[in-house]
Amino acid sequence: MALGGVFMSDTDGNIGTSSTTSTEKVTGLLFDISKQAKFFEEGAGLAVKDKLQGNVIEINSMDDLKELGITAYSGDTEKDLLFGIPYYHINHFFGIQGSAGRLFIMFADCGVDWNAIEQMQRAAHGMINQLGVWTEQSLWKQTDPEAETYSIDLVTDLQSKAASLADENAPLSILLCANSAVIATAEESVKKVELGKIPTCVINARFVSVLLGQGLDADVSAMQLANPNLTPVGNIGAALGCIASASVQESFAWVNKFNLIGYFPDIEMGFGDVTLNSEDKLTSTLKYSSLNKIQLDDLDDKGYIFLCKYSGLESGVFFSKDQTCSNGDYRTVARNRTIHKSRRAVRNALLPYVNSPLKVDPSTGYLSSAKITMFQNIVSDILTTMQNNEEISGFSVTIDKNQNVLKNDTLIIKYSLVPVGVASRIEVVEGLALTNK
């Protein structure tokens, strides 16, 4: 038999279509430098090579960045590490989630695989709950010029890595911010994105969410333009900050709680037509105001998360939803965070009982009623705390009394959570009447 332990798995398909701990706020941010061939060989990267190359760094506040050589955008490509983009996102993260926290960062070449994610989770002892991936790899590909839509491969690759980590009891939610401005092809990359060809990213990938959009301001435009790859700066830092500050059951798109106007005075997509015009500026980065409701609804229906505005809220910028690339039970980041929290807590509570004696009923050979009650109480106590803190609506714990633990040395415990709902849509019917009755 394999090595003993407590092994967790979850089920999908059961539903259809705020207490906090330090661990649920632990966050990771991976910068994929595979498109920066000389990142650690020249300029700012060379200056910090010994500190950053191959290392996972824990940052607890903005004060830690100076020593690491991570500085704000200045316009000097010799001094700005990755064009100031890392500082921009880390600053957003701590600005939103609080001045102190736990953020693990890494700069790694992920052109061949995403093993850096596993390395980061190991360095954090499995405690990273949400991980942002900023990459210059193209989000969309055009393998067939005659195809009606682009293809999307990054989501599948990241889902596979996250699923593997979940099997190792280190589950996390991945937020992907990739190069949406340049379409990868078999030959020369295409710098013009056709909105009608954007594919759905809902491909049964519950651990991954795809982010689009960025701030519309001079520094963001300058950072994108300074990068030869023209990769959008994105909004990954703000998204991670919102998630880290939210309770596990809360959507980071909650309008009343996560207004980002202080970080994004105006917004754009960051893609469209990034060929240079006669003024050496990007031709079009699709201002949010230039997109109509049909186009925005289409992006939402295809599973993307983007910065948005609501009519009537003049001073407001928000994330559109907290959806994942799945339409199953775990179709939101909040639901994944909730089940991940329960998994970690239940597993930690049960680990002391691995290889412990299990008293059986001598008349049946099955698990004794006392032991069944004991294990039910262990799990129920944890889930009751979550319910009292309104992180879940309810739960059930089941232990089959007819388990033959003498035969297989295995105890099977099942629990189900009733999640907290979310008001993604509020529909109101209005009209006139002759009376108020």
Regions flagged by a language model, labelled:
Residues V360, T364-S416:
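C-terminal structured domain segments
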Residues L103, A108, I392-K437:
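Compositionally biased, low-complexity/repeat regions
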Residues I85-P86, T338, F375, L411:
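Alpha-helical structural motif
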Residues A170-A253, F258-F264:
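Long, hydrophobic alpha/beta structural blocks
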Residues T21-S22, L211-L216, N402-D409:
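Short, ordered beta-strand-loop transition motifs
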Residues A244-K371, K414-K437:
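Long, contiguous, structured domain-core segments that constitute the functional module of a protein
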Residues M1-R206:
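Small-residue-rich
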Residues L68, F93, A345, A349, ...:
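Residues that form generic nucleotide/phosphate-binding pockets
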